[in-house]
Amino acid sequence: MKSESAAIDIPESSSVAKGKAPLIAVSRNEKGGYRKGIAIFDFILRLAAIATALAAAAAMGTSDETLPFFTQFFQFQASYDDLPTFQFFVIAIAIVGGYLVLSLPFSIVAIVRPHAVGPRLLLIILDAVALTLNTAAGAAAAAIVYLAHNGNSNTNWLAICQQYGDFCQKVSGAVVASFITVVIFVFLIVLSAFALRRH
């Protein structure tokens, strides 16, 4: 018995011969995965920023200390609402925390649709505004905390942290937490810029 093999030659198309079709498909998958990974990391950073912003606002808003001694006319007490700077801090950081909570759905949209430019562009603009507000509140409060710890001999402002230790610890912790939120916002903006970058 003779075994004959029949071979059929099919000519390659021009796109297969040049290798364009497989390269385009691979690059799209890599870009989508890359942007989706950025979007997931963005969502995690937003959750961390919510925690630090709300912790800063809560720590500052509950900072209150009354000294155990008093006179007939005076009771020695320190509270965040004694200083307008600390009041601004609580309001500004609460606004930033509220914005971060409201930005979570847009971050989820960026995960589901990693190629969508609109939500990412909106987030980068609003993140920059929130970063500015957060930095202003943190810097203003940091100046007052510095005076509370060290005073100012030129103006005869005395340091109060020797007497109001718990108060100073709370407001210092609130300022540190607000600057951690600032650092997270910087990472969020850089991530959004990478996600919007076109190859």
UniProtKB/Swiss-Prot annotation:
Chain ranges sitting on the Extracellular side read 59-87, 142-173
Q: Kindly give the membrane topology term recorded for this protein.
A: Multi-pass membrane protein
User: What GO biological process, any one, is recorded here?
Assistant: cell wall modification
Asked if the keyword Transcription belongs to this entry, the reply reads no
TM region positions:
38-58, 88-108, 121-141, 174-194
Q: Which Pfam families match?
A: CASP_dom (PF04535)
Q: Where in the cell is it found?
A: Cell membrane
Which superkingdom does the taxonomy of this entry point to? Eukaryota
Is Ubl conjugation one of the keywords? no
Q: Provide this UniProt record's keywords sorted from A to Z.
A: Cell membrane, Cell wall biogenesis/degradation, Membrane, Transmembrane, Transmembrane helix
**Assigned protein family:** Belongs to the Casparian strip membrane proteins (CASP) family.
NCBIfam families xrefs: A_tha_TIGR01569 (TIGR01569)
**Function description:** Regulates membrane-cell wall junctions and localized cell wall deposition. Required for establishment of the Casparian strip membrane domain (CSD) and the subsequent formation of Casparian strips, a cell wall modification of the root endodermis that determines an apoplastic barrier between the intraorganismal apoplasm and the extraorganismal apoplasm and prevents lateral diffusion.
Q: What's the name of the protein?
A: Casparian strip membrane protein 1
